[in-house]
UniProtKB/Swiss-Prot annotation:
Lumenal side: 41-673
A single Gene Ontology CC term: Golgi membrane
Designated name of the protein: Hydroxyproline O-galactosyltransferase GALT4
Source organism (scientific name): Arabidopsis thaliana (Mouse-ear cress)
Gene name linked to the record: GALT4
Function field: Possesses hydroxyproline O-galactosyltransferase activity. Transfers galactose from UDP-galactose to hydroxyproline residues in the arabinogalactan proteins (AGPs). Is specific for AGPs containing non-contiguous peptidyl hydroxyproline residues. Utilizes UDP-galactose solely as sugar donor. The addition of galactose onto the peptidyl hydroxyproline residues in AGP core proteins represents the first committed step in arabinogalactan polysaccharide addition. AGP glycans play essential roles in both vegetative and reproductive plant growth.
Segments forming domain Galectin: 185-394
Ranges per topology, Cytoplasmic: 1-19
Amino acid sequence: MKKSKLDNSSSQIRFGLVQFLLVVLLFYFLCMSFEIPFIFRTGSGSGSDDVSSSSFADALPRPMVVGGGSREANWVVGEEEEADPHRHFKDPGRVQLRLPERKMREFKSVSEIFVNESFFDNGGFSDEFSIFHKTAKHAISMGRKMWDGLDSGLIKPDKAPVKTRIEKCPDMVSVSESEFVNRSRILVLPCGLTLGSHITVVATPHWAHVEKDGDKTAMVSQFMMELQGLKAVDGEDPPRILHFNPRIKGDWSGRPVIEQNTCYRMQWGSGLRCDGRESSDDEEYVDGEVKCERWKRDDDDGGNNGDDFDESKKTWWLNRLMGRRKKMITHDWDYPFAEGKLFVLTLRAGMEGYHISVNGRHITSFPYRTGFVLEDATGLAVKGNIDVHSVYAASLPSTNPSFAPQKHLEMQRIWKAPSLPQKPVELFIGILSAGNHFAERMAVRKSWMQQKLVRSSKVVARFFVALHARKEVNVDLKKEAEYFGDIVIVPYMDHYDLVVLKTVAICEYGVNTVAAKYVMKCDDDTFVRVDAVIQEAEKVKGRESLYIGNINFNHKPLRTGKWAVTFEEWPEEYYPPYANGPGYILSYDVAKFIVDDFEQKRLRLFKMEDVSMGMWVEKFNETRPVAVVHSLKFCQFGCIEDYFTAHYQSPRQMICMWDKLQRLGKPQCCNMR
């Protein structure tokens, strides 16, 4: 009996021990099931995030709630937003689950929103048979083939040694009348100009002819002489480094005048107009010369015999008493150009600007503009109502500058993009760029992309580039994208009418890859004050959906001319309110609405991307109100005081503006003297 009891007791102990071990094992697996996600979650937030968070707080004048481990610490989402499928911001947990996908996209550097051209085949788009969609399908098809060849290595740079074509730099270039006409009235300056270079043009203006403007007629005689940057960028109109336009007859004032200016990407700068009055004493001189000399004017008071001439004599006596040396006008000079009368014009490159003399007399001086240098002036064009007899260029540079666009790339680690953060960012900036805009992208990297917010990855900026028609450009573009890590290639053949596809890709990246609170679009010739842009967005009360920029209201499409829009493309009389394309901001929910509509083939696509954005925001506004904020500081035409963005800035102007922002601590333009 005792033995039996002992056996029973020992068996019960063994059974209890097994149960205990099973409970411990179950508890162990239970702990591990909770521990593993915790380990991954804590491991995803590195110490660098904390450091960058403090630098972000230091960069802005007022605190901004970013970072932290809870949903409320990242985006404060109210109940109203919670119920709205388009409004809610992604919480960190969901974003972290997407991290592997995000990293893969980052390494690929290719937008995947346009899988292939068949995306436009399955219907759904209301205007699927339009010219736009046919153009898009063809561009995506060709782009995919080009990219597949690049990605697979089938398209490679030529391995055969290329004989470097060293262009000679002659000290002097001259052409006769017939040669000039045969060369399309352009004199090529192989190595540009240098200090002291001078060009002489011998020509005769035509007699005035009748031109009609509607019901009005006018007698017109004018010509244009331009220094052009012929080697700036292929496929674009060359920048006009100096535009010299004498109007003998036909100016709106009714008097002969001389207009001077510069033009970059079809955007004119601030002009200099000489109308016969000498520049005032308070205007700056150019190498000691006045900007505009005086000549006789056909005024009612008899030109120089009137009050103006008396005033000039008084000024001369006053300057003499004060010890200031300034010559007095002793001759009644005529306007330097006349119909049917031969002239000899000389253009000279000085220390501070260009100086133009006619028949040995100084006429005008034009100060250099920040965006251009003398070596950029590789062509002289003379067009209009004029016969050119000969052109001479002398004292030209002896060295040959490299005009290869790739020379602007500086393969240094300092210019590489920081890695993507592990949590949503405050602002994503998508920058539209063309494949061969190597200099523009490098200037952006060296200027406003060095801002503390960008370097700390609180703000992420990426270039969105379509494929170029030339394969060698695409090969260099792929290398650039792989090295710097800041280029997203949108795989279609670039076309001006398809820029809107890049805009959709920007929204998709901002929503799905970085989950940005705000999404901004700008161009590669736009200078952005990143901190000011965020502050402007944060001014919107509450957590409203927003659309911020330089808003156009009640604009009508142009039906004639170069930028004409057909009724098939846009049947409505007016465009919706839209922000100018060089710089605008969207809230996350608006960007997500655009991406969702595109993926579901409900998005109407129009060739003008800024108008398209206004149209999409208007549609979103039908279901949820959008705070539309208009500000002229998102400058469309050049640069203004206290700008948020400045458009049409050349690479040199971008570097200049960044230098001023760093040294002075405040924004200052670089396109005015």
